[in-house]
């Protein structure tokens, strides 16, 4: 399977519009660099800008665990909810996305995210 994944990736690398490009999560080195950059931001608004940009970039993909760890750098629950929704597009292991739900103390936030995920269309 890994060989086929690699072959598909290589074949689609120069043809991103094909729709078959595999979603490969960000490398550990790139992820750690991003995490440290966000962590160094003092103001919450700056963290939101960094994370919004990272999750909006169509070339960035994350595992659920990577996304959760990044989102936990933001303390306000409404911002976490916004980022969790934004990150869903870029998640490579959506079957594990449920690990993000425990970031929320409010059941309303959990319900809101669940409704978003159920209605999401690629």
Whereabouts are the PLM-identified features?
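General marker for long, soluble alpha-helical cores
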Residues: 1-122
């Amino acid at each position: 399977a890994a060989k086929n994944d690699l072959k598909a990736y290589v074949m689609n690398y120069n043809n991103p519009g094909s729709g078959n490009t595999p979603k490969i999560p960000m490398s550990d080195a790139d992820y750690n660099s991003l995490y440290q950059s966000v962590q160094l931001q003092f103001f919450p608004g700056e963290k939101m800008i960094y994370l919004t940009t990272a999750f909006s970039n169509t070339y960035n993909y994350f595992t659920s665990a990577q996304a959760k760890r990044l989102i936990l750098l933001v303390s306000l629950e409404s911002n976490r909810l916004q980022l969790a929704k934004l990150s869903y597009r870029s998640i490579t292991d959506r079957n594990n996305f449920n690990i993000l739900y425990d970031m929320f103390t409010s059941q309303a936030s959990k319900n809101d995210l669940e409704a978003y995920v159920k209605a999401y269309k690629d």
